[in-house]
Amino acid sequence: MKAFAQRLENLHATRPVTVLGAAVIDVIADAYALPWRGCDIELKQQGVNIGGCALNIAIALKRLGITAQNALPVGHGVWADIIRNAMAKQDLHSAVEADTGDNGWCLALVEPDGERTFMSFSGVENQWQQRWLDALHVPQN
């Protein structure tokens, strides 16, 4: 394990890194059963987490001390504000800001046996625009 930790300490990027992808909100709730048509069930909230594969990678790179250009669309709205504030607390910023629309979120229902069911609401992270990509600073090979 020591050898692995030492390798991580010496890790560095040989080329500029760009992280391209989504930042979303995960609302996680315990459910005694999945809802069926016409029912009304009580949920117990476990937590609200900021997620998305690209955001998780951006956080990991930051912790490793690797500078990255983060292209994670952040919009305007309740969810976007939560994402923007969470990123700022970790000194992360996105090079992509959507003019309109909020970020997406996911409701994860967790049954007593641990099985998870997801209901996702797409936001600006799924509305990519060519001008966002054109504005990124990605050097040629």
Question: What would you call each of these model-derived segments?
Answer:
Residues 1-71, 81:
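Glycine-rich phosphate/adenosyl-contacting loop at the front of the ribokinase-like
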Residues 39-41, 63-141:
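Conserved N-terminal subdomain of the carbohydrate kinase-like
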